[in-house]
């Protein structure tokens, strides 16, 4: 329970809710058991004095912040060890501590050990042979070695074929000789690389018998196991301060004639024999499995970012009173302004839809991964395309949504104590890492153009793109009646036509004599538009299917709330793409006006439950870390308390006055 009395406006909002917030909290957590596990983890980690901050981390130097973050990361790691020993750890525990809300509460600027668990270990599991897993995994799980994943370079990121780091096989010693041949070949950005990890999975061009074989992952020791000094041939360090994720210890890595044994190349999918003979993978896409795994996880992370930002902004908007609506009445809660509602409520709805979609994509990834393990690669392209476009769309929308929430809080949202700067810095980073968003959309678009050609040839398409075949057989969209189902179908029809245009434009360029790659570049805007609408059509379909299904499983009161969430999401999404709808569907001015009035009505129906909905995200005050968004709603008191922690305010007269200002003021005398 909060130590201070709850702000009366906030308490009034909670008392008039039409549903039980705990019911939704359990749903959001994934069920009663996971909800209880979440509470237990919060008690274990958030009540530990060693994991609390006396001084806001925004006042720390870059060096101090790293040391502070590493200290906490090691405490977390020790607790994870104990949970593993007690058999109480699981995927949800790692998700919560490394990418979820609990981890962000403890390590607000990121965890320097995160990539060890999120990338290094999964890469060994996904790309190492059974023998290699036996050799490396126990050491990694027990943190006898600390690893990271070194793929991105100073000169190349998402374009993997452009990576310059090179590994040449020396058959005489059965070793690989790894080099970064230029400055642009230096590995750049891996989390924990700067001063934390002593091993890395290094992705490099593979050469055997003088021939280029493609990219391959190698386990490379970076630092001495005892002294932690860089190994011979290793040039390594931290890349410096950034917009966000300031505690992650992103690093750089140069390699000069670094030799690693043959068995240090992860060989589950491709092999090099002792004599240098190369055995190619069954499918080159298999080597990208780790990135697909992370992209799927990131979709759920974007939902958490929106949940945090919308919780802070909604609670603040219930407490803040300003700008009379009726001149004869007192200043209202700013959440009563329709324009404020339009800023906030769609972000809450997106958080719920992104979480629902993220859970579905995660389940889909696990199913398809099982199929891949059995040698069935049929659905791999579909999974790759979906994970790419959804990662791009959800991260972009989440970053924009966080910024919208910040702006909705006026000047106070600009303060560090609001926590918006940190949330935004962490969220916008997702737009770049694990595949820059534009490139991700282009990856999806290539798949869409391919399946469009298959549909023209009468081939049966997988369910997530079957709407393309439907649109080919239906040249005109009929019966847009404004129902939620018709909005979903309209999204699919618009998406199919966007893909049609991209396909036709590429074919036109080919007929003009351009090669496939040049044609694709010339048609880049058509391609990204097609991928964007494909992802949004998938989100609309998933929201419609899953939220209606959930509404049949919960209480009637919560069911009504979920239906309002769904309607708000779909109507808002439709109006945000109304130009595309008007292009491909015969909508009248009256149809659009009806949608706009309907959006206004959705906001009104959403309003009574807004605070209780964000309460249902069940975000601990330590997770929010915001003077504006605390559960008790005492915004101004929390803001003022934050100023008292400012080191500048610890002395009545700062020394700089006597050193600089006073001589300056007296200089004219």
From Swiss-Prot:
- Name by which UniProt lists this protein: Acyl-coenzyme A oxidase 1
Q: Which residues carry this modification: Phosphoserine?
A: 551
- Which pathway is recorded for this entry? Lipid metabolism; peroxisomal fatty acid beta-oxidation
The family database entries (InterPro entries) matched by this protein are listed as:
ACO, ACOX_C_alpha1, Acyl-CoA_ox_N, Acyl-CoA_Oxase/DH_mid-dom, Acyl-CoA_Oxase/DH_mid-dom_sf, Acyl-CoA_oxidase, Acyl-CoA_oxidase_C, AcylCo_DH-like_C
Q: Which gene encodes it?
A: Acox1
Q: Which cofactor does it need?
A: FAD
Chief location bin: other
Active site at which residues? Answer: 434
Binding-site residues for FAD, renumbered to this chain: 152, 191
Instruction: Show where the record puts the motif Microbody targeting signal.
Output: 667-669
A GO molecular-function descriptor: fatty acid binding
Family recorded in the similarity comment: Belongs to the acyl-CoA oxidase family.
Q: Name one GO biological process term.
A: fatty acid beta-oxidation
**Which domain of life does the UniProt lineage start with?**
Eukaryota
Self-association or partners: how does it assemble? Homodimer.
* Functional summary from the UniProt entry: Catalyzes the desaturation of acyl-CoAs to 2-trans-enoyl-CoAs. First enzyme of the fatty acid beta-oxidation pathway.
Q: Which organism is it from?
A: Drosophila melanogaster (Fruit fly)
